[in-house]
Amino acid sequence: MAHVKNHDYQILPPSIWPFFGAIGAFVMLTGAVAWMKGITFFGLPVEGPWMFLIGLVGVLYVMFGWWADVVNEGETGEHTPVVRIGLQYGFILFIMSEVMFFVAWFWAFIKNALYPMGPDSPIKDGVWPPEGIVTFDPWHLPLINTLILLLSGVAVTWAHHAFVLEGDRKTTINGLIVAVILGVCFTGLQAYEYSHAAFGLADTVYAGAFYMATGFHGAHVIIGTIFLFVCLIRLLKGQMTQKQHVGFEAAAWYWHFVDVVWLFLFVVIYIWGR
């Protein structure tokens, strides 16, 4: 009788993923700092990208392993209606925490734009962007990326409505394919933009704020594209139903969050920040 389940909640077994995820994130972030600052740790030559890439591979491994466990839990009936509501609330809180990350980047950019010499400086006049910084024309590549990301959001909404309201797997799969392709295109164009930038990460406070804000968003686009791709594979395998598709719903929420953040980036950094 000890193994009889008489409640709607999920009792999780011990998992290795939080521990290894923390290690991967620590190595990745430490490697990123070492790479950007060109420093060494205990005499080890980690100033290149290798430590960062090792941590990134570890984080991706944990991501897919953890997702696989969650998928298996859903297929074995562990995700009751109560559990699904908890997963949805948890993901909403996760997105709220991500919002605060971007608030910090926007705060840094706007504060330095309004007070280039610092809020406590007796010199009130300053130049923004700093002298020597050649900014991007927002009406060329940034505008194209904006349209691409908005179209991908439309594709995700189209796919979600087709699946939830009509149960149309074919339309849902087509919509997700379009969204994933557009997500990859956005990332490629962002990389192209970076490669042709007239300033580097360490050039000025403008450059640092620009790359941190847009780069952090770019990382979210990559994660969101992977998220949508996983949903696409699961749909092709028949692992989602109209009643049980929490993963798909979370991916759609995440992608729309990425869309909204980019609109703010486009207006604040590319247009107003010029």
From Swiss-Prot:
Pfam families: COX3. Residues 37-48, 116-139, 198-203 are periplasmic. GO terms for biological process: aerobic electron transport chain. Residues 2-15, 78-79, 167-168, 238-244 are cytoplasmic. Keywords: Cell inner membrane, Cell membrane, Membrane, Translocase, Transmembrane, Transmembrane helix. One of its GO terms (molecular function) is cytochrome-c oxidase activity. The chain crosses the membrane at residues 16-36, 49-77, 80-115, 140-166, 169-197, 204-237, 245-274. It catalyses: 4 Fe(II)-[cytochrome c] + O2 + 8 H(+)(in) = 4 Fe(III)-[cytochrome c] + 2 H2O + 4 H(+)(out). Coiled coil: none annotated. Its main location: membrane. Belongs to the cytochrome c oxidase subunit 3 family. This is Cytochrome c oxidase subunit 3. It comes from Paracoccus denitrificans.
